[in-house]
């Protein structure tokens, strides 16, 4: 089984590429979706996060107030590392389980969609790395316009991630998403076809 690591900075369009590939028949493990499940009320991960970052992160129903966690965790490298030290091992365990299930089911090409593929040390799980690349200033605009983030918050989150240059240097393939959605769709489909052909 060939495992493709799909990554990119916040606001790069990485998840859009994952959806395009799913439309082409790709099986995708979504690290963000795993993280959301691990943060559901009653989970041991959420319990540990609330102990470290404050019980007031939880609402009356025990649900995580995500924006508040982001405000506390992304304020410094130390706090970000603290959050990652809690979440990354649990996410990695779930990803490994997903990979083993896919292998047992005879999946030929598996996609691991992970925003922190390198930072989390999970690039060792994949055979090829695809980076979705967009200039930082364009990502800031997209985060503000499409996700409703404040400009300062958008810049802060981008700063806390690996630099675009470092990501590109570690990539086997780079998809440039500085153009239109139609261009992204064409580039993503062409690359997926290449992967699918290589395993036939």
UniProtKB/Swiss-Prot annotation:
Main subcellular location of this protein, as a coarse class: cytoplasm
Protein origin, superkingdom: Bacteria
Keywords of this entry: ATP-binding, Coenzyme A biosynthesis, Cytoplasm, Kinase, Nucleotide-binding, Transferase
Associated pathway: Cofactor biosynthesis; coenzyme A biosynthesis; CoA from (R)-pantothenate: step 5/5
Protein family (similarity comment): Belongs to the CoaE family.
Biological function: Catalyzes the phosphorylation of the 3'-hydroxyl group of dephosphocoenzyme A to form coenzyme A.
Protein name, entry field: Dephospho-CoA kinase
